[in-house]
């Protein structure tokens, strides 16, 4: 499928499918608890899926009807995220996750799974089985406001193009009543009509699954303190973003400190910080002492569940990050990447850590990550300076030699 830009000028936005205009029925979900409504959603969506057949790639558009099941949907609370889950028979399942932070909440990931064993929907498909695409959305919305968007919102993550429109959404509803205050999407503010338009052609095959056009928010910074008896022995402050590429499907997950537990331990030569929440069974950061003078991040272990329910675990005990002298802390305010394995990396933001020799529960003087860059640049600068001096000496020598030779000829 190739997506064309909306019609310019009048900005008309209409939705045309392969054989003409088709309208799907709106999906509606009103979850309640003891106070009343706790999650409200109404929207329409369809998916255009390219799948591998015997000799060529085929394309099918699935328009989701209103008669679906919502098993697994939940309202969430301050510690647990909200979730909308949809099942369309055995052909398709869809889910979106929400997390709450202070006075706002985030639409985290959209997960779509489709079953190519359904020969009616996917005739001639090879291979057969359940395939999953995960889109990290990262949209941020205020609490106490209903989000509305009549225009089409398109997520193009090969081999699936997803379209959403006619959206009315409020997660973490307060006081049991859907809000009358609205937040309208920017697409509606610039469009003169709200019916979505897409022109479709058969797409060229691709294996790229990286959602390069989808912004991911910066993670919230968390503070983690580990004690040994009555004394603080480990301090860590950082925003954490987990980047997973499993079977070419990207998964980006921001750790929310508000719903994350942590434990740890301190030994003379090693220290451990362990994080866990409803999705992460454990995420370990293990520090070690090097040459009795410095500390560094030696090991990272992770065991967690992806949005599609599959387990993911990676360990690496041969790392060398966040190196600093004992008695000091390590700090890096800019984004830094810890590559744990080919399929797993951790992006850190506003990092500060001290796993040894903590005094009075406070950070010691920090070694900044920019010092590492300075240490790298110093030899280059010294070498360049020496090279410049050598060039000047050679120039002076040749100039002197030329003058001496000229004087000899005149004599």
Curated annotation (Swiss-Prot):
TM helices/strands, residue ranges: 377-400
Ranges in the topological domain labelled Lumenal: 27-376
UniProt keyword terms in alphabetical order: Autophagy, Cell membrane, Cytoplasmic vesicle, Disulfide bond, Endosome, Glycoprotein, Lysosome, Membrane, Signal, Transmembrane, Transmembrane helix
Region (First lumenal domain): 27-188
Protein origin, superkingdom: Eukaryota
Region annotated Second lumenal domain, chain positions: 230-376
Chain intervals for the UniProt region annotation (Important for binding and subsequent lysosomal degradation of target proteins): 402-405
Keyword Phosphoprotein carried by entry: no
GO molecular function: enzyme binding; ion channel inhibitor activity; protein domain specific binding
Membrane topology: Single-pass type I membrane protein
Cellular component aspect of the GO annotation: autolysosome; autophagosome membrane; chaperone-mediated autophagy translocation complex; endosome; extracellular exosome; extracellular space; late endosome; late endosome membrane
Function summary: Lysosomal membrane glycoprotein which plays an important role in lysosome biogenesis, lysosomal pH regulation and autophagy. Acts as an important regulator of lysosomal lumen pH regulation by acting as a direct inhibitor of the proton channel TMEM175, facilitating lysosomal acidification for optimal hydrolase activity. Plays an important role in chaperone-mediated autophagy, a process that mediates lysosomal degradation of proteins in response to various stresses and as part of the normal turnover of proteins with a long biological half-live.
Annotated family: Belongs to the LAMP family.
PANTHER family: LYSOSOME-ASSOCIATED MEMBRANE GLYCOPROTEIN, LYSOSOME-ASSOCIATED MEMBRANE GLYCOPROTEIN 5
UniProt name for this protein: Lysosome-associated membrane glycoprotein 2
Biological source species: Rattus norvegicus (Rat)
Organism phylogeny: Eukaryota, Metazoa, Chordata, Craniata, Vertebrata
């Amino acid at each position: 499928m190739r997506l064309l830009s909306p019609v310019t000028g009048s900005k008309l936005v209409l939705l045309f499918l392969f054989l003409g205009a088709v309208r799907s029925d709106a999906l509606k979900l009103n979850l309640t608890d003891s106070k009343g409504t706790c999650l409200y959603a109404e929207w329409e969506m369809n998916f255009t899926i390219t799948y591998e057949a015997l000799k060529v790639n085929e394309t099918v558009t699935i328009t989701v009807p209103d008669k679906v099941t919502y098993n697994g949907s939940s309202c969430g609370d301050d510690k647990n995220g909200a979730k909308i889950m949809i099942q369309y028979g055995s052909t398709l399942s869809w889910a979106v996750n929400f997390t709450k932070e202070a006075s706002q909440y985030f639409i985290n990931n959209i997960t779509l799974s489709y079953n190519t064993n359904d020969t009616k929907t996917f005739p001639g498909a090879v291979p057969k089985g359940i395939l999953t695409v995960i889109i990290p959305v990262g949209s941020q919305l205020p609490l106490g406001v209903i989000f509305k968007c009549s225009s089409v919102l398109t997520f193009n993550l090969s081999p699936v193009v997803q379209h959403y429109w006619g959206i009315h959404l409020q997660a973490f509803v307060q006081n049991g009543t859907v809000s009358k205050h609205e937040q309208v999407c920017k697409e509606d503010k610039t469009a003169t009509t709200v019916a979505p338009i897409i022109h479709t052609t058969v797409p060229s095959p691709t294996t790229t699954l990286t959602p390069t056009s989808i912004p991911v928010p910066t993670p919230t910074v968390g503070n983690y303190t580990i004690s040994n008896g009555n004394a603080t022995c480990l301090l860590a402050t950082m925003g954490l973003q987990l980047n997973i590429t499993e079977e070419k499907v990207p998964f980006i997950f921001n750790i929310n400190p508000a719903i994350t537990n942590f434990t740890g331990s301190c030994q003379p030569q090693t220290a451990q910080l362990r994080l866990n929440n409803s999705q992460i069974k454990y995420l370990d950061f293990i520090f070690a002492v090097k040459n009795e003078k410095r500390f560094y991040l030696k090991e990272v272990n992770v065991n967690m569940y992806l949005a599609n329910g599959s387990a993911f675990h990676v360990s690496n005990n041969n790392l060398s990050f966040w190196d600093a002298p004992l008695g000091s802390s390590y700090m890096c305010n800019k984004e830094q990447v810890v590559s744990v394995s080919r399929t797993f990396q951790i992006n850190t933001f506003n990092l500060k850590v001290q796993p040894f020799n903590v005094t009075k529960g406070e950070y010691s003087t920090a070694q900044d990550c920019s010092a590492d860059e300075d240490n790298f640049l110093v030899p280059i600068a010294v070498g360049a300076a020496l090279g410049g001096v050598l060039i000047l000496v050679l120039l002076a020598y040749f100039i002197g030699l030329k003058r001496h030779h000229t004087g000899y000829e005149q004599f």
